[in-house]
Amino acid sequence: MLLTLAGGALFFPGLFALCTWALRRSQPGWSRTDCVMISTRLVSSVHAVLATGSGIVIIRSCDDVITGRHWLAREYVWFLIPYMIYDSYAMYLCEWCRTRDQNRAPSLTLRNFLSRNRLMITHHAVILFVLVPVAQRLRGDLGDFFVGCIFTAELSTPFVSLGRVLIQLKQQHTLLYKVNGILTLATFLSCRILLFPFMYWSYGRQQGLSLLQVPFSIPFYCNVANAFLVAPQIYWFCLLCRKAVRLFDTPQAKKDG
């Protein structure tokens, strides 16, 4: 545990510093803000690949969705804790870089950061203070399969990050941006929303239950927890859909005009 925590505490900030240094050396025309924001997205993508890979390994290794075990289901959670702390700081650093030319007081920058990122900060706090204790202690030796499923939700993150990078570089007009937008919607829908019916279906298949019977055959708090987890994902997916509609409507609107 301690070794994994220490490894994560060194790996993610170290990777961020390395990416920032490499970008400033290789792209001297980019501003410091560009380098910091893009480095943040690169680190997020690396974490997403590691989490998704861990999740797939866990899922494939668990023959029983309840009692199946794999060491990554616990060990990667310890690796995740330093990432969540690092990512919270990285988001604040991006806000500071974005507004540093405005000579704002640090307290005002912090308030704006908390205001602009309320949902994401809440998301990180829930993971650290609720999901980590559940995953590491409260669930006992059960449910590694479902922990692996939750890890695979990160599959959409590299596509989200690439979209943010393209926006930062003012490349919203490119074909790459549009294709990436479609992939973002597809992976977000499948891995962050449809993931939950898949977990219910997997449990039902093993227990001989239909998908509709599963919610009534598991503890009520499991349904409540899943509802709290999927609610922000649905909200974010709706925002992505609205953004996609605006993106693909713009050329048609200009043509009609």
UniProtKB/Swiss-Prot annotation:
Q: Which GO terms describe its biological process?
A: lipid homeostasis
Q: How does it assemble?
A: Interacts with GGT7 isoform 3 and SLC3A2.
Major localization listed first in the record, in broad terms: membrane
- Membrane topology qualifier: Multi-pass membrane protein
> Sorted alphabetically, which keywords does the UniProt record give?
Cell membrane, Membrane, Transmembrane, Transmembrane helix
All copies of the TLC domain together span 33-249
In Swiss-Prot or TrEMBL terms, this protein is called TLC domain-containing protein 3A
Give the source's domain of life in one word.
Eukaryota
Chain's gene name: TLCD3A
User: Cellular location of this protein?
Assistant: Cell membrane
Which Pfam families does the record associate with it?
TRAM_LAG1_CLN8
Tell me the InterPro entries matching this sequence.
TLC-dom (IPR006634), TLCD (IPR050846)
- Which cysteines pair up through disulfides? They are none
What is this protein's tissue specificity according to the annotation? Answer: Highly expressed in pancreas. Detected at intermediate levels in heart, placenta and kidney, and at low levels in brain, liver and skeletal muscle. Not detected in normal lung.
Q: Which GO terms describe its cellular component?
A: endoplasmic reticulum; plasma membrane
- The answer to keyword Transmembrane helix applying to this record is yes
Q: Which residues cross the membrane?
A: 1-21, 42-62, 77-97, 113-135, 142-162, 181-201, 220-240
